[in-house]
Amino acid sequence: MARSSKMMVAARLLALALAVSTAEARNIKTTTTEKKDDAVVQPQTFPPFDRLGGGASPAFGGLPGGSIPGSSIPGFSMPGSGSSLPGFSLPGSGTMPLFGGGSPGFSGFGGMPGSPTAGSVPEHANKP
């Protein structure tokens, strides 16, 4: 009898150890699966630099789509940079003043405060 009771205790301990190890293995599997899910869903950087359609700083090695000089918008060019598409470029900086000043016919009117054209009108010249 003593022998069979020892066998029963050993069998129960073995079953308990097996149950604990199975539960441990299930926990390891679920944590591994959770880690895989976390690895699949990763936050993106903003803005996504690989989707931009224009020129970038040389630090990034340039981005695709920046074939028009001085512009990151396809078919549009900033003043003085030139454009391969006629009709989409702004006039060069020598033909139209961007920040006031007016044209030579209106030299005394318009302009930004403190600009050279502001001093050509006596009213502007007397202001502090």
Swiss-Prot record:
Keywords: Repeat, Signal. Residues 52-68, 99-113 have a biased composition (Gly residues). The keyword Signal applies. Enhanced expression in male flowers. Accumulates in the glumes and in anther walls, paleas and lemmas of mature florets. Residues 64-92 are annotated as: 3 X approximate tandem repeats. Residues 1-25 form the signal peptide. Residues 69-79 have a biased composition (Low complexity). Sequence repeats lie at residues 64-67, 64-75, 69-72, 69-80, 74-77, 79-82, 81-92, 86-89, 91-94, 104-107, 113-116. Residues 26-79, 99-128 are annotated as: Disordered. Residues 64-116 are annotated as: 8 X 4 AA approximate repeats. InterPro entries: MFS18. Pfam families: MFS18. This is MFS18 protein. It comes from Zea mays (Maize). The gene is MFS18.
